[in-house]
Amino acid sequence: MVRRYAVGTAAGAALIVSLTACQGSGDDKQSAQVPAAQAIALASQKTATVDSYKVAVTAAGTGGEAAAKMHGTIQIRLKPQLQAVGTLDSATVKGQSLPGGERAILLGDDFYAKVPQQLSQFTGGKPWVKFSISQASKQAGVNLDSIIKRANPAEQTKIFTGSKDARRVGTQSIDGVQTTHYTGTVTPEQVGRLDAGAQQAFKQFYQRSGANKVTFDLWVGKDSLPRKLVTKVTADKGTGSSTMIFSDYNKSFSVSAPPAGEVTDGNQLKNALGSQMH
């Protein structure tokens, strides 16, 4: 159980982290006439003005350590401070099912994860554990703050603006919203519109994985906001895919830190879990 919670917490953190970072045409006739590359660029530009959104995400990977599948829902506020609240509804790692319903909160540098009752002995009975994003970055040797700031619909859509084969497929209703469907591929050499740091991270990922391109399907509403994004990658060691459904753009929601008396320090739980895993 201890190991399963540790893996589940990591999966929930990865899900939330991976998701938190020119106006479009107003009628069907104009939208149909906009070239695919221009429409994708408009979507990236329009989404950059968004303050908050909700996303339901399903991610899956095959092959070795990457064999996993998870589904969750996250509400994210990008401005003025990064805030998010999410639930990991289900997760499977290397064929092992993990507890569902795990809740997590992100407030600036602070990440809170709900502790299953079975593990309350390691937290003094407290139901929440708190981690620092900046401290975790130092321990992992990775700038998680930078990754979080880039992990938003605008940056994700911007990746596909360099595609040389993007094309319009047709129209489709996504959760009651009429959208135009675009599809295409992008390679590490075609991400020139990203900043230097994002380009380097993108290229390094594909060098390590052995992948040479990403296949994407993007559904964009009349307001030039993405409503659905599906990405697929085939690499040397397996495959990966993700499906994201976006909604509730610029809608307000409440999120606050758990009461201080119900929170334990993440290092305490980390040490306890570590001793149980050896």
Question: How would you name each of these model-derived features?
Answer:
Residues 13-16, 105:
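Generic alpha-helical scaffold signal
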Residues 4-14:
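Sec-dependent N-terminal signal peptides
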Residues 2-6, 23-278:
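Subset-of-secretome marker
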Residues 18-21:
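C-terminal motif of bacterial Sec signal peptides marking the signal peptidase cleavage site
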